[in-house]
Amino acid sequence: MSKATNFYLFVLLGVFVALVRTEDEKPPNLTRVPSGLSFSCDGKKPGYYADQQMECQVYHVCTPDNEHAVLLCGPGTIFNQKHLVCDFPSNYACADAAKDADDANAHAFEVKVSPTPVP
């Protein structure tokens, strides 16, 4: 093969790898919370829970009063279960959400009261 042919093959391979990698890293880009979600707070401790069925772009809040709220991360982001924030997919693996939930929610809704200083 000539140097020119090798060069073109190398460029095409690079473009292919870049396209495949970009496609793998894209989260869903929802603009509203979808209907028909199956998540339930029943049996869960109060806290924040990534919805893995929605690729972590949707997350749920289960309150101590047994209320349930559904929230959506912005386009291009997913819910980082470890830090309880919306984050870039390159910073968190949605597949880890279930195992990270208990530790992340251990102190959710906990109110810390500072002692009154004594003069």
Swiss-Prot record:
Cellular component, GO annotation: extracellular region
Tissues showing expression: Expressed by the venom gland.
PTMs per UniProt: Contains 3 disulfide bonds.
Keyword NADP among record annotations: no
Domain Chitin-binding type-2, first and last residues per copy: 38-96
Subcellular compartments: Secreted
Pfam family, one: CBM_14
Disulfide bond positions: 73-86
Key words, A-Z: Chitin-binding, Disulfide bond, Secreted, Signal, Toxin
Family affiliation: Belongs to the scoloptoxin-01 family.
Protein name per Swiss-Prot or TrEMBL: U-scoloptoxin(01)-Cw1a
Organism encoding this protein: Cormocephalus westwoodi
